């Protein structure tokens, strides 16, 4: 399974891309595959404050409803309305068009997993 090298990861299966103080967040291909057909996503609202490791929304598939966790601290500055309107994007392109929300970082995240660490985690769960 694809684990892009330029991203950070969490144990809850979110990915983070940081560019000039803005973190783009999504769920990993591993999580998308485990969920199956994603039918609904409720990301945090623009302007809300999110805290690393805390629930900030939910994602629903035919199989289950799962909490969406923020991997970073900060203020939500954008939500991917295309993924809200068409949740299948999350499963079909989780690292591209299926991103979920963007956060203006309060501080650099300290405990993200490297791609290698995340691969080891998923091999243990897979």
Curated annotation (Swiss-Prot):
Any one GO BP annotation for this protein: glycine decarboxylation via glycine cleavage system
Cofactor names: (R)-lipoate
DNA damage as UniProt keyword: no
N6-lipoyllysine: residues bearing it: 63
Pfam families in the record: GCV_H
Entry annotated with the keyword Nucleotidyltransferase: no
Domain (Lipoyl-binding): residue spans on this chain: 22-104
Domain of life the protein comes from: Bacteria
GO cellular component: cytosol; glycine cleavage complex
Keywords: Lipoyl
CDD domains: GCS_H (cd06848)
Cofactor note: Binds 1 lipoyl cofactor covalently.
Function in brief: The glycine cleavage system catalyzes the degradation of glycine. The H protein shuttles the methylamine group of glycine from the P protein to the T protein.
Subunit structure: The glycine cleavage system is composed of four proteins: P, T, L and H.
Membership in a protein family: Belongs to the GcvH family.
Annotated HAMAP family: GcvH
NCBIfam families in the record: gcvH, PRK01202.1
Name of this chain's protein: Glycine cleavage system H protein
Native organism: Thermobifida fusca (strain YX)
Gene name of the record: gcvH
